[in-house]
């Protein structure tokens, strides 16, 4: 259904009206060109006969040459994604204040942000848009750098409710590569799903565009859940690629080995 959307920033400056067509669930992609200074803008969106809603708009500086693409589930937030029923409960029903952060990951991300001022952080998850506010609050509450969330439409079918998401992540990563052709990326994920393979695929498809791959290793307690049900391992091997790969169970462990490399990148 086509809607006219009015956009205003927090300074009540009218950014104009745009037309967009939403899908049956009301989701839409809107491409609009406006002159804004880099940073985070509080923007309100409104359509006829509806109350306006507000959201953050992230404007990325043209000078930013490094970006971070990070998984959410079991990379920065403990959800136990390898075990579908636990992941569904943790994502949809667990009180946001009780969601646990992966130890040291916010410190790692903050250090990366300090090393690369203005670097955008893109948070990629197979979680549905319905839990956007919960993930957003988690990022803020646990001290992670703010950034756009790239989620998916809700599909309640059992096989796709909590998907592994390789195709979802590939599509968004490829879109970011196209949107920011002069930017190189640090890819951050975990070994509980298909992130190692997915990120290795991205590195092969875009030679010279991936600075590093970071894989957070699940703890034995996290990784044994699926094995106890299926008899199969729930973790994936370290990716085979020419790109530097850094692994560890916590952000602090990863930072110790990754920091010297990042400093060489800055030279």
Model-inferred region functions:
Residues 2-7:
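Short, small-residue-biased leader/transition segments that mark boundaries at the very start
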Residues 8-17:
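Short amphipathic beta-strand segments in non-cytosolic proteins
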Residues 16-34:
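Glycine-centered loop-to-beta-strand initiation motif
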Residues 37-49:
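Short, aromatic- and glycine-rich surface loops/edge beta-strands on solvent-exposed regions
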Residues 51-60:
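Edge beta-strands of extracellular beta-sandwich domains
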Residues 67-81:
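Asp-based phosphoryl-transfer active-site loop
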Residues 93-119, 129-133:
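Short, acidic loop-to-helix structural element flanking the phosphoryl-transfer center
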Residues 127-267:
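C-terminal cap/substrate-recognition subdomain and adjoining C-terminal extension
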């Amino acid at each position: 259904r086509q809607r006219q959307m009015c956009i205003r920033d927090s300074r009540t400056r009218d950014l104009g009206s745009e037309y967009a067509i939403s899908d049956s669930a009301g989701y839409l992609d809107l491409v609009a060109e406006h002159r804004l200074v880099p940073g985070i803008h509080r923007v309100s969106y409104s359509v006829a006969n509806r109350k306006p809603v507000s959201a953050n708009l992230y404007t990325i500086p043209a000078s930013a040459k490094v970006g971070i693409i990070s998984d959410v589930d079991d990379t920065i937030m403990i959800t136990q994604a390898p075990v579908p029923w636990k992941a569904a409960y943790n994502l949809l029903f667990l009180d946001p204040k009780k969601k646990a952060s992966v130890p040291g990951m916010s410190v790692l991300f903050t250090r990366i942000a300090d090393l690369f001022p203005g670097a955008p952080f893109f948070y990629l998850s197979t979680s549905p848009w319905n839990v956007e506010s919960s993930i957003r609050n988690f990022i803020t509450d646990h001290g992670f750098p703010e950034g756009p969330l790239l989620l998916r439409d809700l599909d309640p079918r059992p096989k796709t409710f909590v998907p592994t998401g390789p195709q979802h992540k590939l599509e968004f990563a490829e879109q970011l590569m196209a949107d920011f052709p002069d930017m190189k990326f640090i890819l951050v994920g975990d070994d509980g799903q298909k992130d190692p393979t997915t990120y290795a695929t991205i590195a092969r498809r875009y030679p010279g565009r991936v600075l590093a791959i970071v894989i957070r290793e699940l703890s034995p307690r996290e990784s044994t859940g699926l094995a106890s049900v299926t008899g199969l391992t729930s973790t994936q091997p370290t990716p085979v690629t020419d790109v530097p790969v850094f692994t560890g169970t916590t952000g602090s462990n990863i930072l110790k080995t990754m920091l010297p490399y990042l400093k060489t990148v800055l030279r």
